[in-house]
């Protein structure tokens, strides 16, 4: 009799994806983030489900319902902060995962990469709408500012914004629909993640050397299951340290003030994981130009595979490209810092320089360095 693991129609799929999957023998800890993202997603769906049981998506009661969760619901404070800080962990893992893909040339798996970009956009949309739900000052004004960006679209912009708002300002209708979307999107993310894995398993994983590992594969279980569990424990330890010791470290104090359309906060800024894109948006004085730069700052990932000029897949043996990659990382950190600063000298100039450098590195410097390295190998 054959093993049920290999014969049962449903269990067979799980077996071929997580147990008997042939994996490269040399993938490093940078390959842990895929599974960590899966865990983050499950954690967010579960904590979100329990929060939704007590939350009311009405402008009159949303803020007090979140307060009620924190004060009166059993372990409500912990569920709320696990959800809020879980989003931060989600984005840390996302950035690491995308960075790994760029460093090791995983973007040559075009379908997997493009589904990944779609996932990134969907997660960003979900996080943005989730930030609006507590209905604090920064929730309200963040929603107003970001949705207002769509009014920069010629001809249909204003109508589009009012259609999304469900009125002439961010109000009850906006909050209700944002809650509905925030609830449904994680399940769409689940479906996209399954497609992402499907495409990945068509080709098999990349590895640090960038060379085909078909001749040297090991089973996913037990080798990488145990390795993933280590990564998971480290991540959960970091998350729970944040939740139990300084849950508001990454939040904005303004969000503890109920939303007031008559009083604008001095500095409107999104959560930390959007600050790099926000800095790029603000660095362009023109509204439409800023919106285009904002979208392009993420969409640029879609053309990264087309800009690959090197004969080698990854950057493991390409010191020049490595320098540029880490320059890009430093540049993104500077943009993140600038996004949280007021719009005044010298922050405006720093933000503009960092934004220009961001696009220059990806569009011009990296393809040139690939070509130079090809020439150096010939000599």
UniProtKB/Swiss-Prot annotation:
Q: Which InterPro entries match?
A: Cyt_b/b6_C (IPR005798), Cyt_b/b6_C_sf (IPR036150), Cyt_b/b6_N (IPR005797), Cytb/b6-like_sf (IPR027387), Cytochrome_b (IPR030689), Cytochrome_b_C_euk/bac (IPR048260), Cytochrome_b_N_euk/bac (IPR048259), Di-haem_cyt_TM (IPR016174)
- Segments spanning the bilayer are 33-53, 77-98, 113-133, 178-198, 226-246, 288-308, 320-340, 347-367
Q: How is this protein situated with respect to the membrane?
A: Multi-pass membrane protein
**Can you tell which superkingdom this protein's organism belongs to?**
Eukaryota
- The answer, when asked if Iron-sulfur is one of the entry's keywords, is no
Cofactor annotation remark: Binds 2 heme b groups non-covalently.
Needed cofactors, names only, are: heme b
CC per GO annotation = mitochondrial inner membrane; respiratory chain complex III
Q: Where in the cell is it found?
A: Mitochondrion inner membrane
Q: Has the keyword Endoplasmic reticulum been applied to this entry? A: no
Question: Which residues are noted in the entry as heme b b562-binding?
Answer: 83, 182
Residues reported in the UniProt entry to bind a ubiquinone: 201
Q: Which UniProt keywords apply?
A: Electron transport, Heme, Iron, Membrane, Metal-binding, Mitochondrion, Mitochondrion inner membrane, Respiratory chain, Transmembrane, Transmembrane helix, Transport, Ubiquinone
Which BP terms does GO give this entry? Answer: mitochondrial electron transport, ubiquinol to cytochrome c
> Which GO molecular function entries does the Swiss-Prot or TrEMBL record give?
metal ion binding; ubiquinol-cytochrome-c reductase activity
Locate the coiled-coil region(s) and give their ranges: none
Binding-site list for heme b b566: 97, 196
| Gene3D superfamilies the UniProt entry points to | Cytochrome Bc1 Complex, Chain C
- What does this gene product do? Component of the ubiquinol-cytochrome c reductase complex (complex III or cytochrome b-c1 complex) that is part of the mitochondrial respiratory chain. The b-c1 complex mediates electron transfer from ubiquinol to cytochrome c. Contributes to the generation of a proton gradient across the mitochondrial membrane that is then used for ATP synthesis.
Belongs to which family?
Belongs to the cytochrome b family.
* Quaternary structure (record): The cytochrome bc1 complex contains 11 subunits: 3 respiratory subunits (MT-CYB, CYC1 and UQCRFS1), 2 core proteins (UQCRC1 and UQCRC2) and 6 low-molecular weight proteins (UQCRH/QCR6, UQCRB/QCR7, UQCRQ/QCR8, UQCR10/QCR9, UQCR11/QCR10 and a cleavage product of UQCRFS1). This cytochrome bc1 complex then forms a dimer.
Q: What else is known?
A: Heme 1 (or BL or b562) is low-potential and absorbs at about 562 nm, and heme 2 (or BH or b566) is high-potential and absorbs at about 566 nm.
Name of the protein: Cytochrome b
Q: Which organism is it from?
A: Galerella pulverulenta (Cape grey mongoose)
Gene label: MT-CYB
């Amino acid at each position: 009799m054959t093993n049920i693991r290999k014969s049962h129609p449903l269990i067979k799929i799980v077996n071929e994806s997580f147990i008997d999957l042939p994996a490269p023998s040399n993938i490093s800890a940078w390959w842990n983030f895929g599974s960590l993202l899966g865990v983050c997603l499950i954690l967010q769906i579960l904590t979100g489900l329990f929060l939704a049981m007590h939350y009311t998506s009405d402008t009159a009661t949303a803020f007090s319902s979140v307060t009620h969760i924190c004060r009166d619901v059993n372990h409500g404070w912990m569920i709320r902060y696990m959800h809020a800080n879980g989003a931060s962990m989600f984005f840390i893992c996302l950035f690491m995962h995308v960075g790994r893909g760029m460093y090791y040339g995983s973007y040559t798996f075009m379908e997997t990469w493009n589904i990944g970009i779609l996932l990134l956009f969907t997660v960003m949309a979900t996080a943005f709408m989730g930030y609006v739900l507590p209905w604090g000052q920064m929730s309200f004004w963040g929603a107003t500012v970001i949705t207002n960006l769509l009014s920069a679209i010629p001809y249909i912009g204003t109508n589009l914004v009012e259609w999304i708002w469900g009125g002439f300002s961010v109000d009850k209708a906006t909050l209700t629909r944002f809650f509905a979307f925030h609830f449904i999107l994680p399940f769409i993310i689940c479906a996209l993640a399954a497609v992402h894995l499907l495409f990945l398993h068509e080709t098999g994983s990349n590895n640090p050397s960038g060379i085909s590992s078909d001749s040297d594969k090991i089973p996913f279980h037990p080798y990488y299951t145990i390795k993933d569990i280590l990564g998971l424990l480290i991540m959960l330890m970091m998350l729970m340290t944040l939740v139990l010791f300084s849950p508001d470290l990454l939040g904005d104090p303004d969000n503890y003030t109920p939303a007031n359309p008559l009083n604008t906060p001095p500095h409107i800024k999104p959560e930390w994981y959007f600050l790099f894109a926000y800095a790029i948006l603000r660095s362009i004085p023109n509204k439409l130009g800023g919106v285009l730069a904002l979208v392009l700052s993420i969409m640029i990932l879609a053309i990264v595979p087309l800009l690959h000029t090197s004969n080698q897949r990854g950057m493991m043996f390409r010191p020049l490209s490595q320098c540029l990659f880490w320059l890009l990382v430093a540049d993104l950190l500077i943009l993140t810092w600038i996004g949280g600063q007021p719009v005044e000298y010298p922050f405006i100039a720093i933000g503009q320089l960092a934004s220009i450098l961001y696009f220059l590195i990806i569009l011009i410097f990296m393809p040139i360095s690939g070509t130079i390295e090809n020439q150096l190998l010939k000599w």
